[in-house]
Design a protein with these regions (language model features):
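Hydrophobic residues in well-ordered beta-strands that form the structural core
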Residues: 125, 146, 210, 366-368
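Conserved PLP-binding catalytic core of the aspartate aminotransferase-like
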Residues: 308-309, 322-361, 378
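A short helix->loop->beta-strand "cap" motif at the edges of active sites that frequently abuts
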Residues: 142, 203-206, 235-236
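Conserved core of the PLP fold type I
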Residues: 68-199, 216-217, 221-229, 233, ...
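N-terminal small-domain helix-loop-helix segment of the aminotransferase-like
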Residues: 2-104, 111, 295, 403-404
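PLP-dependent enzyme catalytic core of the Aspartate aminotransferase-like
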Residues: 234, 347-350, 357-404
Length: 404
């Protein structure tokens, strides 16, 4: 491969909660490991790979100038987004005026809700649910109504369209948050599924907030379908949210963006976000996006997805062979696997907290699935060198799931 996805980079002391926050965030971060075990971060959703070199190059080049005053986004910022969306997702007709900066995807979610629904109103969200949705939507004063995903006979997560319709009607819901690809389940929705969902939202006059931050992390054999692309109505009722952060490991720089084609919808969302003045772009995050959304970035992402596919294949095969009673739906996108440990816990007389604590004790920091509405689940991040995935599997085998 052209790019390095095998080096183990020491992140300690380099502003990374993935390694430095163990034992410091009760209920979220793993406990500190026992002496003799180094930390393998498999919890928070960032990667343990160096970003594409062009990101650093663009940041360094800008940082060599000694002034960082007020600024307007460069035309190149919009050009890179338009070209990236065209190349990666086949998006046509995207113009600079359709694009707006967001100081995080969750900020975009809340701004859209504030533009269209009243505090106390219900918002439809699928479950399992990304914990960030839960915290931000509820903190903003809205009531979440969950429509649970269902596993089909092949173990693939599916939307329950009848349940969606029923929940929308019963709760008089006019806003829905759609996660595509889905976190934490890793589902890449097919066109006909999105079409059917969007038709239901049309019938119930719902504004749709489509979180597509994972849209570049798509495993072989699958394709991301932008929600706005499935119909003209979907294009006009959807606020789509993107970022280079998940793709290029840039969460610490903060720099998301929205795509809104509907002028009225766009004006209302921007009016809300402008009132707080929170939504100002950071000059270095602008240059990071410009550096990421280059031809080299495309090559890097293609290689990354090959690496992630290999990691997921290894991990899932290991679970099948060694962890009897643990099940999962193989992800089609993202770098997360959502493990269902219900049967294992029942057979061994343990609970999910024991699995979390014992994993952390031997340096494997995976994430509690309960805040994602997985009652006996663990969310596992596989965006790290394969050698670390192998080491984590070995420790979990010897010291946790098959400890003697």
């Amino acid at each position: 491969m052209k790019y390095d996805f095998t080096s183990i980079i020491d992140r300690h002391g380099m502003d990374a909660i993935a390694v430095d926050s163990w034992g410091e965030i009760p209920g979220m971060a793993p406990n500190a490991p026992d002496e003799g075990f180094d930390r393998i971060p498999m919890w928070v959703a960032d990667m343990n790979f160096a970003t594409v070199p062009t990101v650093q190059e663009h940041i360094i080049q800008r940082a060599q100038h000694p002034m960082f005053g007020y600024f307007n986004p460069r035309p190149e910022y919009f050009d890179r987004i338009i070209e990236w969306q065209s190349r990666r997702n086949g998006v046509e007709g995207l113009l600079p005026e359709h694009i707006g900066y967001e100081n995080g995807v969750l900020g975009g979610v809340v701004s859209t809700l504030r533009a269209y629904v009243q505090p106390g109103d219900a918002v439809l969200v699928h479950s399992p649910t990304y914990i960030g949705f839960t915290k931000s939507i509820e903190a903003a004063g809205y009531r979440i109504v969950h429509s649970p995903l269902k596993l089909d006979d092949q173990g693939v997560w599916r939307m329950d369209f009848e349940d969606v319709e029923r929940k929308l009607a019963q709760n008089h819901i006019h806003a829905a948050v759609f996660c595509s690809p889905h976190n934490p389940c890793g589902r890449v929705w097919e066109r006909d599924e999105i079409e059917r969902a969007m038709d239901i939202y049309r019938q119930h006059d719902c504004v749709v907030i489509s979180d597509e931050i994972w849209s570049d992390i798509i495993l072989p054999g699958h394709k991301h379908i932008p929600t706005q692309s499935v119909s003209e109505d979907a294009r006009m009722r959807t606020v789509a949210l993107y970022a280079p952060s998940k793709t290029f490991n840039l969460a610490g720089l903060v720099g998301s963006y929205h795509i809104i084609y509907n002028e009225t919808l766009r004006d209302r969302v921007r009016t809300v976000s402008n009132k707080t003045h929170y939504n100002e772009m950071n000059v270095l995050s602008m240059h990071a996006l410009i550096g990421a959304y280059q031809s080299q970035g495309c090559e890097w992402v293609d290689e990354l997805n090959q690496v992630l596919a290999g990691n997921i294949e290894y991990f899932c095969n290991y679970v099948d062979e060694h962890f009897a009673g643990v099940s999962y739906s193989r992800p089609q996108g993202t770098y997360m696997v959502f493990l269902d440990c219900t049967e294992w816990c029942r057979e061994h007389g343990r609970d999910i907290q024991w699995l979390l604590d014992e994993g952390a004790r031997v340096g494997v920091g995976y994430q509690d699935g309960r805040p994602f509405h997985g009652p006996c689940h663990i969310r596992v991040n596989l965006a790290l060198p394969l050698s670390r995935v192998r080491e984590a599997c070995d420790r979990l085998d010897r010291y946790v799931f098959n400890a003697r």
